[in-house]
């Protein structure tokens, strides 16, 4: 008989009635790079996969109708079927293979996504089937296979069991696993499908779960809808109907499985036909090696069993014989409970003991079994228990989120470590435990005293631990001999920054670099770009970035630990970055650098949650820097102060103070050690014990310096030049320079005021010329600051004010030079007066150094910001009232000056209590206005026919009342509340904020030339001349020594490393103490609860 004829004959088979439909959700398979056309897929399936047809009719004597032992009626057999009367029916002898006629996509009731299905012979080769799954159905090679068995009949799923299944599906999704089930819409398979659906809906569609159902073709209801017609030569989509309400003994397929394999042995209504092919496929996968496997080359497979009867027992027995580990859920009933109870037996396992357990957990089933069948069950159970190392039992009542994953990982490890081939494969075992994050197992079973690990042995798993963010494993590898310095080669760092670095993080880094133009950000961006350059070559749009390269490419080879730390920090790997931080040199600098990077990136992140995480991690590193520096400072003040000024090229050449200020780490700057260091800088060689009034007195009576009124921190070496040294040390002190500048700045302001009020003539007199000279010195100082700071100069508000003041002064001089014109001379004087305000306000900045005035000035700055917000709200009310008032009172005012007064100025004055008088007709005075608009008076209000004000008082007066109420009561009190909140915030951190602001003033005067104002102008001329000579001679710059190579740096860093270890020990000790305290509290609470229970029992007994 031909293949077409057989296929047409099969179309007439009866497969049950159709019923109601049900909604579905089906996952789609994950694709790989391999792609085949539909015709290639059809040709491959038809050439390699078969169906089976009964070709010998053997009448079943037990059946009422003319039914063959294959389950089909004689009319349902293909043409040419022979009659068999004597022989016992056997599928191998009495069926024949034909090319399969049922494959393609399966659509359940026209809803949901499509799945794949295939009808195949029970003798199909596992290798061919695996090729179909991976190469033609485009499934990725699994990292794990979970074979779920048990509970094929309908049963009520307990909430705890549903939680276990949900965790099982989550594991499958996160590990890239295949799930193998029976594939039908009954019992356990139905619940597994529902959990698959829920997880697929709730998670990213790119992480679809692969759920493969393997069912018997002869047990599938409505299977005629799956058979392709003769005309379907290419793609075929079967519309499968789920008649869930029929009482047909056949099963319907589950709509939530992604792939369905329907095993055919030519029978109808015969269950468990698929068991053999399923076991063979599992064994083939478990023995197959894969280069991409995370478990030492093998694809692990685990059997997950719950409940179940005979077939579940056989499946577990077959899995154990194939060296496949099994996880059994105790409490799920039936066979699972039998096995779980027998595993706990320590004595020799006897048949009577096994039978007792069977009777206990399966009383009805065992009572119906013949004795021979019971013996078979006992034999299978004994065979399973002989390989008890392959069994792992979890209790359903104790199952939590981690119980399932721990059980699977432990089962895989036991199977792996006891396998003759793999028991000495330590690398493979370690990979398995690393994949499942089983640190305790790795510590107890692998890293023992019996084995000595070389650094090279751990490098591969170390790389995996880094990319999988396993900080505890990284620490474990470091503790067991991994040399991180040797591991971090340029190739490893390139792989980390290119393949395992988020593109979004890189974009945010680039945005931050462009937005803030910061030295550290620029350096880090170049560091990352240097590693990613090879990927840019493939991107035409980034061709312009090909020239990005570090100034010194050897930086990464000299500082690989810092590069790895930056990689972890940029990607917010919180715990991993802490482990790496502990290994770096210059931990204080690294912690502050991390705080700086994280806070800057948080500002450019669009995701609020991600930005919050970065801020939180930045604060943690600031805290670490504070605590570590405190530990260092308490041990040795001098070495701790050296840490503050230690700079490293791996952090853009910045030091701790610079990074802390750029990151606004106020808590670090406010530390006593940092403030003491700033005080030393502030006073220079002058002892801090010297009172400020003594220093100021010496400014006016200079000879007192050599009389011992001022004490110094050290004595001069040359006693003959002792007096000279005292004077030099005194006048080069930043505090003295500051005090001198304050005195002369006040004198400058007094001179400026004198010129404006008493000596401003058409021809400048001597005081005015002296004023010009002093402003020129100020101008030179601002040019120097601009030259030193570059574009960052204008980020300081005070620098902007200085520039504005100088600009106004130059503008005033320009008008002043036209003294022949009195109008121009007056304009110049007005500009000078306005400029005087700016120069006077500049005096506020000088007093930020004061502990008392400094915080008040900061409050004032913050309150100015509140005023701007208030003015915005006030402007809304003011303009609304002003325009309405002007429009009601007057018609067609053409003078802009008077429009401004009426709309803006007068409503503004009303906020301060000046009530408008032109809204009440009874008090309106026409002598204060003009009808024509030719006088310098406001336009009179519009009149009616009786020459009375036309405006309605019932509108204007309530309008004024509402406006006064809104502005004088609501808005003013809002401003007061805002001020109160701002003052409260500053007051909470009063000392910290002042200390942070003090840093800028100290650094400003420390970086200035130590020459008093105004004599510093001569030094400026000298610097300009010297710079010109350098440009002419073109002297070659000597290369600076790289950091961490100077002896003093190495000694300081080595000492900091010791302090870091002390600090970490204290942290761990404190954590252990807290844990012990919590345990003690729990014990106390438990004791109190027991006492309470006893008391309640006594009360209950007394009541009875």
Curated annotation (Swiss-Prot):
Annotated phenotype, changing residue 934 to Q: Abolishes glycosylation. Shifts threshold of temperature activation from 26.5 to 24 degrees Celsius. Reduced cell surface expression, association with lipid rafts and response to cold
Mutation effect (residue 929 to A): Abolishes ion channel activity. No effect on cell surface expression. Reduced glycosylation
Gene Ontology CC entries for this record: external side of plasma membrane; membrane; membrane raft; plasma membrane; plasma membrane raft
Subcellular location: Cell membrane; Membrane raft
Listed InterPro entries: Ion_trans_dom, TRPM, TRPM_SLOG
Stretches of the chain found on the membrane's Extracellular side: 759-765, 818-822, 891-895, 913-953
Principal place of residence: membrane
Gene Ontology biological-process entries: calcium ion transport; intracellular calcium ion homeostasis; positive regulation of cold-induced thermogenesis; response to cold; response to temperature stimulus; thermoception
Keyword DNA-binding recorded: no
Glycosylated residues in this chain: 934
Membrane topology: Multi-pass membrane protein
Regulation (activators, inhibitors): Activated by cold temperatures and by both natural and synthetic cooling compounds such as menthol and icilin. Activation of the channel requires the presence of PI(4,5)P2; PI(4,5)P2 is necessary to gate the channel. Activated by intracellular Ca(2+).
Ranges of the Cytoplasmic topological domain: 1-733, 790-796, 849-853, 985-1104
Transmembrane region(s): 734-758, 766-789, 797-817, 823-848, 854-890, 954-984
Residue stretches in coiled coil: 1069-1104
Disrupted gene: phenotype observed: Trpm8-deficient mice have severe behavioral deficits in response to cold stimuli.
Consequence of substituting residue 934 to K: Reduced ion channel sensitivity to cold stimuli or menthol plus cold stimuli
Residues given in the record as Ca(2+) binding sites: 782, 785, 799, 802
Chain spans, region Disordered: 1-22
Domain notes: Cooling agents bind within a pocket formed entirely by the S1-S4 helices that opens to the cytoplasm.
Assigned protein family: Belongs to the transient receptor (TC 1.A.4) family. LTrpC subfamily. TRPM8 sub-subfamily.
Subunit record text: Homotetramer. Interacts (via N-terminus and C-terminus domains) with TCAF1; the interaction stimulates TRPM8 channel activity. Interacts (via N-terminus and C-terminus domains) with TCAF2; the interaction inhibits TRPM8 channel activity.
The protein's name in its UniProt record: Transient receptor potential cation channel subfamily M member 8
Species lineage: Eukaryota, Metazoa, Chordata, Craniata, Vertebrata
